[in-house]
Each structure stands twice: as C-alpha cells, then as structure tokens.
Amino acid sequence: MTIKLLSESTINRIAAGEVIERPASVVKELVENAVDAGSTKIDIILERAGKNLIIISDDGVGMTDKELEIAVERHTTSKLDETDFLNIHTFGFRGEALPSIAAISKMLITSKKRDNQKAFQIKLIGGDEKQIAPAIHNEGTKIEIRDLFFATPARLKFLRTDKTELAATVDVVKKIALAHPEISFSLTHDGKTLLKLKGQNKDAENNLKQRIIDVIGEDFIKNASYIDFKSPDFSIYGYTSIPTYNRASSEDQFLFINNRPVKDKLLQVALRVAYQDYMPRDRYPLCAIFLQIDPQLVDVNVHPAKAEVRFHDPNYVRNLLIDSIKNALSNKSHIASTTIASSAIELFKNPFVNKEPAISKPLNVNSKPSEYRPATSPTVPKYTPNNSCQKLIDTLPHARIEQEVEQRIQNEPQKSSQYRLGAAKAQLHTTYVISQTEDSIVITDQHAAHERLGYEKIKNYIKNEELIKQRLLIPEIVELPDEKRADILYENKDKLSKLGLSLEKFGEKSIIVTEIPNILGDINVQKLIQDLADHLAECGENIALTELIEHVTETYACHYSIRAGRKLSADEMNALLRQMENTPFSGQCNHGRPTYIELKLKDIERLFGRK
C-alpha cells in the first residue's frame, strides 16, 4: 500500500479519538471554552445524557463571523502566545476541541461579539459543509451538538448507559464549578434541572466556601479543615475533611492545578500519605484542594485531555501538599465527625415527638425485666484486627499504662466548664467514659482513645530516636514457618533496629532476638516476630522504612492501650480525657474510628419533645 496524505476530516476524527471519549468530554471542552471567554453565566442542556443533544450557552466575549469561520479549523486559538508557550493561564490552548467535536457530530454555533450589532451562526455536519449565516442572538455564544458520534458509529458501542454517562457529565460540571465560584452554572437533563449554582460576589474564601456547600454539601464544610499556604511562586488553599469524616471511594476528592481539575497520581499519593496515620487504608478523605503555581513550573500539555500534569520539582510539590494538609488537620485534630452524633440522634428519635403526646406508663416494680436489646449503633468504618494483634493482647504489660493514667490530677472535683471534653461522670459497661460539658455529654471509647494516645507517643519516640532498647536477659530464639520469612527479617534487620528490635539469623528458619523496645516491657517476643515476618512476607522484599514503621507502630499501640472491660476510677477517666485534649488527632484512633461522640443538650431535649 502506498503512503498517502490523510484528508482533513479523517485527521480530525483521529484527533477526536484522543480528546472526545464520551458526552462528558464534549461538555468539558465546551464549558472550559466558555470559562476562557470570560462568561459569568453558563447553561448546559442535555438529552439522553448528551448522546442526542448537548447545548452550551454562555454570556462570554463572543465571536465575529470571521472568527467563527476559523474557530472550527484545527489548531486555531486566541489563547496561546507563540513566543511564551510555557506561560499558559487558560483551560484551552491547543485549538483541537471544536474541530474534533465537529468531525463526529452535527454542530451549530451561534455567537455575537460584545459591542457588535450583528450575530452569526455556522453549521457543520461531520466537520464538513460549513454554512455561515446571520442570526439573532444575545451577546455570547451558544453551541448545539446533535447526534454525537454519528460519523464514528463504532464509538457509540463503547458508551455506557445513560445513567452512567450522565453521572460523568455531572462530575465534570461540578469540578469546573468548584474552580469558578464567581460563575453561575445550570445543568438540565431531559427537562429536569440537576444543578443550579448561583455565582458569588463575596470575597474569595467565602465564594469558595459557599460553592463547596452547594456542590459537595454543608456537612463536608462542618467536618473539614481549611488549608492556607502561600509562598512567592506557590500557594495551596481549600478544604479537606477530618479523618473520621470519610468515604468508601475517592469520588469526592477534587484536586486542581491553577483552577484546572486534574487526576494526578503524585497529588493523590500525597493526599494518601497525609492521612495514613489517621484513617483506615480502605477509606478516603473528602477534599477540594487548589494548588496555584507559576505556569512555567508545571507542564499541562502532557495529554490532549489535559487531566495529567508534570511538575518541574515533583518532590517539592508532594512534600508541600503533605505538610499543608497535616497542618490543616492539626487545627481540628481533637474533633470527631459531627455526623456520627447526628446519626446517633436519628436512631433514638421518638416517633411520637411532634404528634399526639404519649402517656408514660407507671413503672411496675414487681414485673419481670424485659429482655435487653441494645440499640443499633451508627455506622462507622469497620476495623478487623489481625490475628496476631488479638493473640498478643493478653501477653502485654498494662502496669506501665495504668500507672501513667492513674496519676492524680487534682483532689477536688473537676468542673464541666473547665475542659473541652468535660468532667467524667460515669463509666458505661467498663468500656465507655461518660463526661459532661456545659452544653453536652461526651461518650468516649476508652480503648480507642488510649490507642491513639499510645500511637502518638510511640511515633514521637521513633521520630526523635528516643526509643530505648531493652536487652533481653536470655536472648529469644524464634522459629519461623519457612526460610523465606527468616531471610526477609534478616534483610530488614537494620530497619527493625531503628524500631528497637535487634535480631540475627540463627539457622535456616530461626531468628534470635537480643533487644526489644523498652516501652513494651514483658512482651511476647515469639508472637511479635512472627507477626512482623508475616507482614514482611506479604509486602515483599523491598518494603519502605516508613511503611514498616507505620505497621509496627500500629501494632505496638494496639497492645499498649487500655482494654475495653477494665474498670477505671474517676481520676483515671479524667486523666484520659485531659490527655486526649492535649494530644493531636485524638478525635480518632489509628484505625480511623471515632474516639468519642458529643451529644448536645439541645439534641437530647429534642428527643424528649422539650424543643
């Protein structure tokens, strides 16, 4: 076959394959064009999730008839300065979107330039048969896309259901709307309004806050910390959820570079690392985080879809984002999710409140007690400890922990108003500490709370290299199931040494342990080493020190803590509460579960119909 030059329409259809994957891709490109045009109002109308019809209307700068004619040609744009290709401030700059969309659909563009008397429209079918004519239109541009992919029917077979395609489009509009709270957006599907967002004219932070409430929800703002970092060539701002307010997927994570929505692995990993000490591995935080960076320090021209970026100094960006998130979380590190308490309130709502008043029956002291049925607890992330953790529970010393908690704070009773978590009043089922503040009661899970306290303490010991080793009087020989586990432990002996464990190879399948961390006291060395060997075997040979530290610290803290079922004195309960108030991230244990919930007095009064 001889080499030949492809036709312009064929080239455009090939380009469309990279840029336009589904109706959501069309909406993204056209809405971004509307934003670049300086619009203050953008309306989107869809039929059959955009498969039949997509209409994008804006009140932007508009186009003349001459501009309309060349706008649908490849690589024509008003947004790129050829002398400064790296200094890109707009969404679009490649000049590919309109001709690519036109090549696979029936397109009609109507536009009127600002301050011009006349409007014009251009009609294209499959990118050909261009027809320009006068029209009647307000200032701005309206683009109609009909029968998407009619020119490439094979692509239609790969589209999902209308519901799935619509969800993708809604997600695209939400992301762009979050980045531009000053613009009004509406999205209508088959005659039904799905989104109606009013443009804000307040200060920048309040604009963003209100738009986040409209898009993600007010609950998110109530359970989020504000991020605020500034430097000469870099800034990070936005909101990120506290650890106990999380989701089972990452769908509600919105990340932006210079107001451009991105799915960047570097940023996603940084977000994960920032939360790794405070959230289960199968849960995800919610966030709307904006990074503003000098355009010359980031490359957005990696792919035509422009969802991926490259940083000039990726490690700098990664570390800066991690530190910014951690600093923001530390401002609310003692707070547990407000939705947990709300869920609890809903469970106990009296069905007769606000209806006919129910008459309480007098108590019959001679009647037999009815069977006790515990109330269903609110849903929280489920944590299943590993077998080795449970096996080690009974082997660990509690004397050191008890001695620490039993330190007397004051001889006189503590006042509820003195402390954020209040004064301890009772212990429920030898598991939960009940305390009272001025306007609420607080229920604390004693094991989860002390587990977080222990985790932070051990983590600081390791970070500051203050973990003291205790030499065993008689070295412990641990026999492992196979030679592989013994080899992996020995290969990581230097890393384990930094965690307070000194060991050597002793035969093919055995390890001899000579030193352990002093903080653990009389621990069952056999079970600890077997647990570590199993973990290293799962992770492979090249486990990072940070990952090893995380696993070992969690294991230490799990057994370090006060167990459920242990009776505490009033002073012990108050000591635990005071330590929580002075320990970062005490609102959740290191598995992401809440350590306490707070029930406001006004909510309790509502339960009894008082308010």
UniProtKB/Swiss-Prot annotation:
One of its GO terms (cellular component) is mismatch repair complex. It comes from Rickettsia bellii (strain RML369-C). InterPro entries: DNA_mismatch_repair_CS, DNA_mismatch_repair_MutL, DNA_mismatch_S5_2-like, HATPase_C_sf, MutL/Mlh/PMS, MutL/Mlh/Pms-like, MutL_C, MutL_C_dimsub. Gene3D superfamilies: 3.30.230.10, Histidine kinase-like ATPase, C-terminal domain, MutL, C-terminal domain, dimerisation subdomain, MutL, C-terminal domain, regulatory subdomain. Belongs to the DNA mismatch repair MutL/HexB family. The keyword DNA repair applies. It comes from the Bacteria. This protein is involved in the repair of mismatches in DNA. It is required for dam-dependent methyl-directed DNA mismatch repair. May act as a 'molecular matchmaker', a protein that promotes the formation of a stable complex between two or more DNA-binding proteins in an ATP-dependent manner without itself being part of a final effector complex. Pfam families: DNA_mis_repair, HATPase_c_3, MutL_C. This is DNA mismatch repair protein MutL. The lineage of its organism: Bacteria, Pseudomonadati, Pseudomonadota, Alphaproteobacteria, Rickettsiales. Keywords: DNA damage, DNA repair. One of its GO terms (molecular function) is ATP-dependent DNA damage sensor activity. HAMAP family: DNA_mis_repair. GO terms for biological process: mismatch repair. Coiled coil: none annotated.
